Amino acid sequence: MLTYPGSDLETFRPFWRRDRIDLGGRKGFVRLAIREGAPIVPAVSAGTHEQLVVLARGDGLARLLRTEKWLRTRVMPIVLCVPWGLTIGLLPYLPLPAQTTIAFGEPIRWPQLRPADADDPAVLTRCYDEVVGVMQRMLDRLSAGRRPWLGQP
């Protein structure tokens, strides 16, 4: 099972948190991997958050507008983008030119776990934290020395 950050919470995290993995505590992918005995292949990218500058995720605005109910998103981002400038919401935009680098990690396996362990919150949290930790270390390596919009030195 390939795990790549990309939920609403991850996609629209603020620019200054672009080098942080934020899966929003969502553990469904871990539950599925444990239940099916499937490995998780972590994937991360550096540079995609330079194509659209998110100033704020807009969690409070999304709650106020109840976007989770009608848009299935918990965010209403405040962004700086071309051609609109400063915007609120999910308008189409022209991505800024940015070098994007993607890395795939080694599969993460838990052969000692049984399908029934997928319903144990402590097991889910431990496995989730392991995946997030691996992904964060991968992103740290990709981001080291990176200059926004210019890519690697």
Where are the regions a protein language model picked out?
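Non-catalytic C-terminal accessory region of glycerolipid acyltransferases
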Residues: M1-P153
